Amino acid sequence: MSTYRKLAKKQALRLSMAIVTMTSGVMGWMATVHADGVTNIQKADSANAGTITTTNNVWTVAPDKVEGDIATNAFSKFTLNQNNIANLLLYKNGQNANKLVNMVNDRIDIRGTVNALKNATTIGGDVYFLSPSGMAVGRTGVINAGSITALTPSADWFDKHLDNGQAKISASDMDALKAGAIPLNADGSIVIDGRLNTQSGIHLRAPAITVGSAPDAAAALQSKADLDFTDLVNIGSVSAGLG
């Protein structure tokens, strides 16, 4: 077993960036990024299928529910292929949240552009991605948000916070997520070969974290208080429709 693998098994690595730009580097042990495939975004509860709409390669995802300052989604699958955009809304039926927790049963695979929207035209909000298996952001993948936190919780923790396809996240759970104080899946991994763009921080927590898994990977983690998302939210001729 390599030194990196031993270290990865002993403790989780955490990246916490307030104003950081990274273009390459490896942390933890090398993990395999999923092969290219079709976009497949499904809610865990079929009753919430109507919260996902698609127009011209743009997927608009309303939260399952908004309770106070917390919006939640529970997905069975979240695979976003290149040349596709997913707009994740932090609002629903006149209710607005500043935090969005996305719980995903399967490994998260992002090769398109994910935009977190605090209103119809503005990127923002603290966005959390939780999957026991982890997350891969491919070379063409982009996530735009106020802040980004990705974690690989233990299966036990994940199951306790998912009830009949509905996420159960309390204010105290949010405090634990923010502090990185939840148990992790020993086999979970996060691979970033694409770009994460935020205004108030990037936090990655998993037993294995890789930023730039290949020499030609265009991995970049960027967090700037005055970051302008105007040129980051679209993909070529595919418009996110943010006005």
Model-derived segments and their meaning:
Residues 2-243:
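Extracellular and secretory-pathway beta-repeat/beta-biased strand scaffolds
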